[in-house]
């Protein structure tokens, strides 16, 4: 027997996407931050609910700025969570050295525990390194915008003068005036 009642259409909730990145405009240097912003806007236009999580401490530590610029306007469907602390250099250094979000771990965990369908990591070098990947419970993706997972200086350019074809990371980090990563 056929049910005479029409079946209501299924209501499909929008896909909830978290984008986790170190840099995001206006606290960025170009490439990866701009890409993540464009990607967030494209996802929102496609009907997704997007939340961007980034850490302004990294930008402050790398630029020497103590004041964070005001946020840029975002379209409907994009929410930006800017993390910062009273010790931006210390926070960035602890993250870089340990490969985990030492100062901002609780804040990142609380944000990622908000029921996302997808968590998409981008340049996470100074927002939590590989340790941030353990946070949140969703489908997880990582886009490698640079080589920091295999090169502490991000560029595979040994001693800032030649193609890297063998590991000499401690000496190379010193050439780049960066502390070597402990992990």
Where are these regions (language model features)?
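Charged, low-complexity surface patches
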Residues: 32, 100, 125
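Short aromatic-enriched loop/helix-cap "lid" or pocket-rim segments at secondary-structure transitions
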Residues: 31, 62-66, 93-95, 133, ...
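Short catalytic/ligand-binding loop motif for oxyanion handling, primarily in non-cytosolic enzymes
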Residues: 26, 59-62, 127-130, 148-158
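Short, flexible active-site-adjacent loop segments at beta-strand->alpha-helix junctions, enriched
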Residues: 23, 56, 84-86, 125, ...
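A conserved catalytic-core segment of Leloir-type glycosyltransferases
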Residues: 52-114, 118
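Acceptor-binding helix/loop patch of EC 2.4 sugar-transfer enzymes
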Residues: 87-91, 142-183
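Short N-terminal targeting/anchoring amphipathic segment
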Residues: 109-128, 139-145
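N-terminal subdomain of nucleotide-sugar transferases
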Residues: 2-73, 112-114, 136-139
């Amino acid at each position: 027997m056929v049910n005479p009642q029409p079946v209501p259409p299924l209501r499909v909730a929008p896909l909830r996407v978290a984008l986790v990145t170190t840099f995001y405009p206006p606290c960025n240097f170009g490439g990866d931050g701009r890409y993540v912003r464009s990607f967030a806007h494209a996802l929102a236009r496609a009907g997704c609910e997007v939340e961007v999580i980034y850490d302004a401490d990294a930008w402050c530590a790398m630029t020497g700025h103590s004041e964070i610029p005001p946020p840029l306007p975002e379209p409907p469907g994009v929410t930006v969570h800017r993390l910062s602390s009273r010790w931006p250099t210390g926070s960035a250094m602890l993250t870089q050295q340990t490969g985990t979000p030492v100062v901002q771990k609780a804040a990142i965990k609380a944000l990622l525990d908000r029921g996302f369908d997808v968590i998409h990591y981008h340049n996470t070098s100074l927002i939590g390194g590989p340790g941030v990947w353990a946070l949140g419970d969703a489908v997880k993706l990582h886009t490698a915008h640079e080589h920091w997972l295999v090169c502490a200086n991000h560029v595979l350019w040994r001693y800032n003068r030649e193609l890297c074809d063998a590991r000499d990371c401690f000496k190379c980090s010193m050439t780049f005036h960066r502390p070597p990563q402990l992990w």
